[in-house]
């Protein structure tokens, strides 16, 4: 599927591309230009019913398919993703807006997830213990759980779906994916390549839409589990409604990630890492650096360095060479971001770099330049809320103790970083910070696919996180067999 031919995005159900029964459509925009590039249907619960029934029917045979055959299909799928790497990256840039280099990196992360899923059979093995009593042995066996529903966001249209469905189907489940209605084109291409890899009909299904599709998955009795990534309010809703309907749910939510810079930090390194973490992907990622807490003695130096580096950032269409900062996803998100900048000024923060004034902001597309506030306090909205945009807040502190105390007062706890050369400070940080993913002298501490991904508090709802052994646990159920064999 190409942007030129994708006038109306279809659903993918039972191995067929079918039109939604809904006549309601939503425009898909190129956020760098504001141009409409496709129309996506706002599908109904009837569409969801068709997809779930197709997935349930496919589960009967797919769950019995030999594990090595499942793995071979995923290995072939991985190679097809590699073969189409540049096309996939360009498609991400066109419908999401991030720079081509960042999109290229996202494709890599998606490929790594598929590689992990292809090797997951080694993690799916059960456990046995002979002679738990005379002549008696026990064993644990893993089995798939059925139809899985996946609900994914706009900001990583390849990586997040690849967190979910490859591992789920490797474990023998079938899958119904609801991609973001803002970025449906990449998901469609992923399905095309999965079919080319030999994935049987009905194992992967896609239903495009919004609220009705989400509720359809949450309410359907044949859907046994829900994987979700998105905003905090929706994550909480998905978790509550899904568990009310007796489903397993993992819901990855919002973030307000703190980066702590101590007096002994390498400021050149810290500056480069923070700039990339704060303004990469236009700040639209759950691992973005949102707040910097810096010790007072070096605060002026760090602020000066950050502003100087931010001034060098090239803003524009992500397909253009040298562009680092692309647009935010939609015009209303641009307006929301500008509202937060206004709020920061009104509440007394010092605006040291104003992203509203960049030339690109005044043209076509949904651009907001890199914005930096100094002298931010925890009473301000720009400290409290997830802005999900290129806005960085700087809080000045007297000590590591104070920095950790401030970070721990956030309702979010996805990621946190520290810049220091002190092992003792790193240990204190590791032991006392309330966050799920930690970094030392790195800006984005996102783990590889073979480790669990997610945070604490209002950044995550559930028990088993995405990826790694948590993912295998989430997508399988166990049977215990105790046997007596006497001579």
UniProtKB/Swiss-Prot annotation:
Assigned keywords, A-Z: NAD, Oxidoreductase
GO biological process: inositol catabolic process; thymine catabolic process; valine catabolic process
Residues reported to bind NAD(+): 154, 178, 181-182, 231, 386
InterPro entries the record matches: Ald_DH/histidinol_DH, Ald_DH_C, Ald_DH_CS_CYS, Ald_DH_N, Aldehyde_DH_dom, MeMal-semiAld_DH, MSDH_GmP_bac
Residues spanning the signal sequence: none
Pfam families membership: Aldedh
Coiled coil: none
Superkingdom per UniProt: Bacteria
Listed EC numbers: 1.2.1.27
Pathway: Polyol metabolism; myo-inositol degradation into acetyl-CoA; acetyl-CoA from myo-inositol: step 7/7
Catalytic residues as annotated in Swiss-Prot or TrEMBL: 286 (nucleophile)
Reactions this protein catalyses: 3-oxopropanoate + NAD(+) + CoA + H2O = hydrogencarbonate + acetyl-CoA + NADH + H(+); 2-methyl-3-oxopropanoate + NAD(+) + CoA + H2O = propanoyl-CoA + hydrogencarbonate + NADH + H(+)
One example GO MF annotation: malonate-semialdehyde dehydrogenase (acetylating) activity
UniProt family annotation: Belongs to the aldehyde dehydrogenase family. IolA subfamily.
Assembly: Homotetramer.
Function: Catalyzes the oxidation of malonate semialdehyde (MSA) and methylmalonate semialdehyde (MMSA) into acetyl-CoA and propanoyl-CoA, respectively. Is involved in a myo-inositol catabolic pathway. Bicarbonate, and not CO2, is the end-product of the enzymatic reaction.
Protein name: Malonate-semialdehyde dehydrogenase 2
Organism encoding this protein: Bacillus anthracis
Protein encoded by which gene: iolA2
